[in-house]
Design a protein with these regions (language model features):
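Non-catalytic cap/lid and distal C-terminal segments of serine-dependent acyl enzymes
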Residues: 1-207
Length: 207
C-alpha cells in the first residue's frame, strides 16, 4: 500500500459532514491510479496488500471498490476497527497526531454507520469474489523476537483477524489464513508473510 499519512486511515475524512481533505481513498484510487496508468504503464489487473493500518486499507479499499482489485492481503492488519475498545484507541491516536478525534469517521456511536461503512468486518460480503490472505501473530515472542516480550497490539489484532476470518468463511470468501501463533507487530513477520502471500497475489495479476 502507498503511504496514507501518519494516521490517515486510508479514508476520505468525514470532517463533521463537510468532507474535504484529507481524502486518501480518492487520492489513491482515482488520482494516483490514473497517474500510474498514464505515466508508468500500470495495467488494469490490480491486487492490493498492506500491513497494520495498511492492512485495513487493503481490505477496506477492495471491499468498498468491488472489482478494482483481483486479490487482497493483510498482514497484522486492523481489520475490525469497531472491535471492543479499539475506536477509543483510534481516536486517542488522532489526538496524539494533533487531529480532531471526530474528524475521521465521527463518533463511533452517533456515526456508527460511517464506521461500519469502512470496517472490513461489516464489508465481508463485498469480498465474496476477491481472494483474501490474512496473517497475524498472537503477540507472544516468536522467532524474530527477544525472549519474554509480549505485544498487546498484535494480540488485539489477532482477535480481530480471527473474527473477520470466521465471518468471511460463513459468507464464502476465498480465504487463505496464516495465523502463525507467536509473533509481534514487527517487520520480519510482515516480510515473511509477503513472501507467503505472493503466489496468491501473482495469480490475481495474471488473471
Amino acid at each position: 500500500m502507498p503511504e496514507a499519512g501518519p494516521f490517515g486511515w486510508y479514508s476520505d475524512w468525514w470532517n463533521h459532514g463537510a468532507g474535504g481533505p484529507p481524502a486518501w481513498e480518492t487520492f489513491h484510487l482515482r488520482e494516483l491510479r490514473r497517474l500510474l496508468e498514464r505515466d508508468y504503464g500500470a495495467g488494469h489487473r490490480r491486487v492490493v496488500a498492506g500491513l497494520s493500518m495498511g492492512g485495513f486499507g487493503a481490505l477496506s479499499y477492495a471491499a468498498r471498490n468491488r472489482g478494482m482489485f483481483r486479490a487482497a492481503a493483510s498482514y497484522s492488519g486492523v481489520v475490525h476497527p469497531l472491535h471492543d475498545g479499539f475506536p477509543e484507541g483510534i481516536m486517542a491516536g488522532l489526538v496524539e497526531f494533533g487531529e480532531d478525534p471526530l474528524a475521521l469517521w465521527g463518533d463511533p456511536v452517533a456515526q456508527r454507520r460511517i464506521w461500519e461503512a469502512h470496517d472490513p468486518y461489516y464489508l465481508v460480503g463485498r469480498l465474496r469474489h476477491t481472494p483474501v490472505f490474512l496473517s497475524v501473530g498472537d503477540g507472544r515472542a516468536g522467532p524474530f523476537d527477544p525472549p519474554g516480550v509480549f505485544d498487546e497490539l498484535e494480540a488485539e489484532l489477532s482477535l480481530q483477524n480471527h473474527l473477520v476470518a470466521a465471518r468471511m468463511e460463513r459468507v464464502g470468501v476465498q480465504l487463505t489464513t496464516d495465523f502463525y501463533g507467536p509473533g509481534t507487530h514487527t517487520w520480519p513477520y510482515w516480510e515473511r508473510e509477503l513472501h507467503r502471500s505472493l503466489p496468491m497475489l501473482l495469480r490475481g495479476l495474471r488473471g
